[in-house]
Amino acid sequence: MAKTLSKPASGALAPWLGISLIVILFDQLSKIAILKTFAYGAQHALTSFFSLVLVYNRGAAFGFLSTASGWQRWAFTALGIGATLVICFLLRRHGQQRLFSLSLALILGGALGNVIDRLVYGHVIDFLDFHVGGWHFPAFNLADSAITVGAVLLVYDELRRVRGSR
C-alpha cells in the first residue's frame, strides 16, 4: 500500500494564532474602554500602589525614543510586522512544542496589539500604572503584559530544554 504524504503536525498554526487573537481582542477592548472612560493624563487610584491612567507612548518599552521626531512610529510598526513573520514561521515549524509555541503566541498577540495602536492612533495606548512611594514604573498595557509573560515563558522553556539535554 502506498503511503500518502501529509503535512506534519508541527504545522498546526490555528491554535497558536487563536491564542494571539484572544490577546489582541482583550488588549484592544481594554484600550477602547480606557479611551472612552478616561481623560488623557487623569489618574484614577485603585489601590495605594496601582492606578489607571491614560497615556500615549510614541516610543517603545519604557518610553524609549518617545521624544523622537516621528520616524519611530513606522520603525516600530515595521519591527512588529517583521516579528510577526518570524514568529509565524517559528510557530509553523515548532507548533508541537507547546510551551515554546504558547510563549510565541503571547508575544505575537502583544506585538500585533501595539502595532494596531501605532497604525490606528499613531501611538500606543498605555493605562496600567504601578507605583510605590517615590518609585514609579512606566505605564503599560495588556499587550505589553502578554509580551513580557511570553518572554519569561520563552526563557523558562529554553532553560528547561538546556537542563534536560544534560
Swiss-Prot record:
Residues of the signal peptide: none
Protein task: This protein specifically catalyzes the removal of signal peptides from prolipoproteins.
GO MF, one annotated term: aspartic-type endopeptidase activity
Annotated EC: 3.4.23.36
Keyword Nucleotide-binding: no
Catalytic reaction(s) noted: Release of signal peptides from bacterial membrane prolipoproteins. Hydrolyzes -Xaa-Yaa-Zaa-|-(S,diacylglyceryl)Cys-, in which Xaa is hydrophobic (preferably Leu), and Yaa (Ala or Ser) and Zaa (Gly or Ala) have small, neutral side chains
Tree of life domain: Bacteria
GO biological process: proteolysis
EC category: hydrolase
Family membership noted in the UniProt record: Belongs to the peptidase A8 family.
Active site: D126, D144
GO-annotated cellular components: plasma membrane
Alphabetic keyword roster: Aspartyl protease, Cell inner membrane, Cell membrane, Hydrolase, Membrane, Protease, Transmembrane, Transmembrane helix
Membrane association type: Multi-pass membrane protein
Pathways involved: Protein modification; lipoprotein biosynthesis (signal peptide cleavage)
Protein's cellular compartments: Cell inner membrane
Keyword Cell membrane: yes
Protein name as annotated: Lipoprotein signal peptidase
Chief location: membrane
Transmembrane parts of this sequence: 9-29, 45-65, 71-91, 100-120, 135-155
Cited PANTHER family: LIPOPROTEIN SIGNAL PEPTIDASE
